[in-house]
Amino acid sequence: MTYCSKANQPSYPFILPDLPYDKESFKPHFTRETFDYHHGKHHNSYVQNLNNLIKDREELQKKDLEEIIEWSSQNAEVAILNNASQIWNHTFFWYSIKPHGGGKPSGKVFEQISKDFGSFEQFCAQFKQEAVGQFGSGWTWVVYHDNKLQIIKTSNAGTPIVNFMKPILACDVWEHAYYIDYRNKRSDYIDIFIRHMINWKFVEDNLIQ
């Protein structure tokens, strides 16, 4: 099963994927510098680390990224798991946002949110509570699991796909995602994420696939 074809990569050597938008396009909410560091340095370092970790592991070089995540999670290969997961998580995150995004969704996503959370406002409140409340670095996710939407948190490089949960939205709450522009104000960052950044088309595509 492929959880997200846009986040997956077919085989070694893995590459840093291009951003699906210009780095300047999130102004005034985020500066180019944030994307230069977040994508060009942090995300890229995970790609380089994983390639170095498996450069002599022919059995792993034939696997796609999601297969490496699954295999390493089952075989206590922590360094491989952490770097592979962070490549996948970040790529999924880049598609979870778009310039001039956010606001209220429509269609199937809005219907499912209303069904599972009571209202869009309640969903936003719970999402913000979970994201702001994540202790230390990690991720906040919306997943479709057990026939309903759920908001979950993962610490550090954790990813829901190791628990066979289907992610439909990711929010990076590592400090490097927002510290250049928002310093320690994670709450402000989450407000901007919800109001101006969520790519609801990507969310809907994940939900209905």
Swiss-Prot record:
Checking Gene3D superfamilies in the record gives: Fe,Mn superoxide dismutase (SOD) domain, Iron/manganese superoxide dismutase, C-terminal domain
Which InterPro entries does the record match to this protein? Answer: Mn/Fe_SOD, Mn/Fe_SOD_BS, Mn/Fe_SOD_C, Mn/Fe_SOD_N, Mn/Fe_SOD_N_sf, SOD_C_sf
Tell me which cofactor or cofactors this protein depends on.
Mn(2+); Fe(3+)
SUPFAM superfamilies linked? Fe,Mn superoxide dismutase (SOD), C-terminal domain, Fe,Mn superoxide dismutase (SOD), N-terminal domain
- Work out whether the entry's keyword set contains Cytoplasm: no
Q: Where does Mn(2+) bind?
A: H38, H90, D172, H176
- Under which name does UniProt file this protein? Superoxide dismutase [Mn/Fe]
